[in-house]
Amino acid sequence: MKRVNVILAGGASRRFGEPKAFAKWKGGMFYEQAKKAFGGGETVIISRPEHIKKFLSNRERHVLADEPRFRGMGPLAGIYTAMKQTEGETFTVISCDTPLVTRKTMVALEMKLTGNLDAVIPVCKNREQPLLAVYHKRVQDVLFDQLTQNKLKMTDTLKRLSVCYVQAEDIGAGPEEFANINTQDDYTRLLAHVESSNQD
């Protein structure tokens, strides 16, 4: 099955104060860390129209804005846009604000999308993580239906799908991999954590 990697980088980043996708991280930017976790293959970045030029100037070739009718409708619109505008059977999704996610974790999730499953969703500390997940192309019509009804919660969408829920600890994924960097305080703590780890 052909896999397409999807980086969700279309959030408003209001609490962060600047586009999170371009936050500095390990000699690069947050979104580039997501690309490393994919480990290669076709990658599409879903972003806001005003940020596309910056991605292109950083030599990214496949950058899309949400479908016009669903613009500004959150990650559901981003995943739908990727499915509609690219040729793939499975879609591995990473939100750009989770820079600690590893390739090992994403491979483990990808391997579990088999048979008639629509999605593989990790669960960490009793919280579903639908923005670090794998989806089959067949869910596109469900996403469209949810968007047209303005039902934008990912958890509501998952109720309509055949989902394999995977406990993070069962695939050796640490809770830090699912931590969202939403504010500058989160970012400062992240940098301090990494600096401390490097000194150990």
UniProtKB/Swiss-Prot annotation:
Its EC number is 2.7.7.77. It is found in: Cytoplasm. Its cofactor is Mg(2+). SUPFAM superfamilies: Nucleotide-diphospho-sugar transferases (SSF53448). GO terms for biological process: Mo-molybdopterin cofactor biosynthetic process. Keywords: Cytoplasm, GTP-binding, Magnesium, Metal-binding, Molybdenum cofactor biosynthesis, Nucleotide-binding, Transferase. It comes from the Bacteria. It is an enzyme of class 2 (transferase). GTP binds at L8, A9, G10, K20, D66, D97. Mg(2+) binds at D97. Gene3D superfamilies: Spore Coat Polysaccharide Biosynthesis Protein SpsA, Chain A. Pfam families: NTP_transf_3. It catalyses: Mo-molybdopterin + GTP + H(+) = Mo-molybdopterin guanine dinucleotide + diphosphate. Transfers a GMP moiety from GTP to Mo-molybdopterin (Mo-MPT) cofactor (Moco or molybdenum cofactor) to form Mo-molybdopterin guanine dinucleotide (Mo-MGD) cofactor. The N-terminal domain determines nucleotide recognition and specific binding, while the C-terminal domain determines the specific binding to the target protein. Belongs to the MobA family. This is Probable molybdenum cofactor guanylyltransferase. The gene is mobA.
